[in-house]
């Protein structure tokens, strides 16, 4: 929240808003840390794929580590640089979930639970990226990344509106960015 909220938006949260932030972070961390740990790429997005004569190659894997089972699918379908239609995201997540279950990847047996995990993981990534992109602009003089922030701020807003545990985050984002009409799937 230091780079995006304080620096980019020039906002200092009051005590209530800080409490909302702390509640939101706790809800996200509780979800993410409860997930099974598997080997994850950590930067699994279209920009890191290359088609070769032998098949698909994955680039930029030096940061791979053990992390939440939803990390890579959240990275791919909640890309900071590409917007996917929500029905496409649901379809791809269902396909991933079905195949992962068949090969024994430790994911929830209930799809709605897995989708929630994917959304919370995507939310954590986008909150982090908002701060990183603001930092790249203000500290490193790289303003081009800020052009992509509306996309993942919208991801954050959309996900926060879907889950009661994230309603404090919804209020923070609406206060920070202005409010919008609610549209989308609910679980």
Q: Language-model features: where?
A:
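ATP-dependent phospho-/nucleotidyl transfer catalytic cores
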Residues: 1-41, 50-53, 57-59, 67, ...
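Active-site activation/catalytic loop segments of kinase-like enzymes and analogous catalytic loops
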Residues: 2-8, 69-106, 120-140, 152-159
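A structural signal for alpha-helical segments
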Residues: 16, 84, 118, 140, ...
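Hydrophobic HxD+1 residue recognition
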Residues: 44
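Histidine/acidic-rich helix-loop-helix segments that form or flank divalent-metal centers
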Residues: 107-116
């Amino acid at each position: 929240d230091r780079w995006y909220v304080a620096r980019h938006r020039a906002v200092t949260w009051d005590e209530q808003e800080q409490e909302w932030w702390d509640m939101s972070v706790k809800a996200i961390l509780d979800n993410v840390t409860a997930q099974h740990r598997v080997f994850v790429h950590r930067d699994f997005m279209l920009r890191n794929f290359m088609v070769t004569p032998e098949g698909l190659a994955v680039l930029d894997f030096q940061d791979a580590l053990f992390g939440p089972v939803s990390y890579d699918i959240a990275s791919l379908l909640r890309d900071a640089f590409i917007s996917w239609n929500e029905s496409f995201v649901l379809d791809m997540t269902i396909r991933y979930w079905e195949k992962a279950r068949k090969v024994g990847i430790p994911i929830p047996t209930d799809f709605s639970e897995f989708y929630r995990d994917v959304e919370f993981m995507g939310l954590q990534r986008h909150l982090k990226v908002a701060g990183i992109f603001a930092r790249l602009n203000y500290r490193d003089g790289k303003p081009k990344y800020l052009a992509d922030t509306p996309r993942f701020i919208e991801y954050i807003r959309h996900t926060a509106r879907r889950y009661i545990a994230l309603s404090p985050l919804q209020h923070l984002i609406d206060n920070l960015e202005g409010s919008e009409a609610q549209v989308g799937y609910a679980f």
